[in-house]
Amino acid sequence: VDTIRKADSRRGRIAYEVAGLAWLAEASDPGAAVVPLLDHGATWLEEPRLVSVAPTPLAAEEFGRALAHTHAAGATHLGAPPPGFEGDGWMGEARLSLLHEAMGAANANAHRVGRCQSSDATDPGPHASREATPDPARASSSEESWGAFYARERIAPYADDRTFVAAERTLIDKLCERLESGVLDHGQPRLVEDAKNRHNRIGAARTHGDLWSGNVMWTPDGAVLIDPAAQGGHAEEDLAALAVFGCPYYERILAAYNEASPLEDGWRERVALHQMHIIMIHGAIFGRSYVPEAVAIARRYA
């Protein structure tokens, strides 16, 4: 078997990918296929080299339906890591906060962003210190809203003063405040909501977490997920991420997904909102070329 070996000596990088691949693979029947993990160590992993083919409308539709079932496999809460993984995750060179317990609504209110303060969310190198103990305010019996989570964990950490000027950060802050108010909250797709109603341990979708189109490999056997940043999240974020850089037969994927697991009304108007996280990540990693898009999204929803 022709293989690919990925190596990274930085703490937790390989472990996060290994855990994410295994977690997504648990849902791969009837969920989306996931690249097999052949072997791994603390700083490396091996996968088969996938054969790439041109996607077809049929393959796109099959992928849309399968992705709906992956999401419906569920996660305990927003920001949940793959089971067994400790610490924060990564999207490319950017840190990704993972919540090992659900943030309760009352505690989330006490820790609201208020201002999108500057922070260093990019990789500071292998010798940088990291928080040793979890924030005790990250637990409560009443789970916070999606908007509060999205503002605090997925937008604010990347609104740093190296990338954004003061006026731009102020606009992003307004978006964060509106998200925290709850007016932009919305439900998960139907299969995820059904799973939440059936299982008290499911509170969010099981998401790939970095589902730009390059992380979908089209093979002779159909679409295969690679390079996840797996987490508990909102299913619409995966769907929105597919469109950030364009995706073959995107409308076919959406239609098949929506047939298998109907999306909540107004989902098309929320695509850009759910793209804000991946755009902010790209700004943190690659600089100001992504700022105009982030500012446009903030202005639209703030």
Model-derived features: positions:
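ATP/Mg2+ or Mg2+-diphosphate-binding catalytic cores
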Residues: 124, 282-302
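A mid-sequence, solvent-exposed acidic-amphipathic segment
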Residues: 168-225
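ATP-binding pocket architecture of kinase catalytic cores
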Residues: 2-145
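Hydrophobic alpha-helical segments that form the core
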Residues: 272-280
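Phosphate/dinucleotide-binding and metal-coordinating scaffold of catalytic cores
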Residues: 161, 174, 251-254
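A general structural signal marking secondary-structure boundaries and capping sites
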Residues: 25-28, 71-78, 162, 183, ...
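Active-site Asp-x-Gly
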Residues: 139-151, 200-206, 213, 217-269, ...
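Solvent-exposed, charged helical/coil patches
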Residues: 157-166
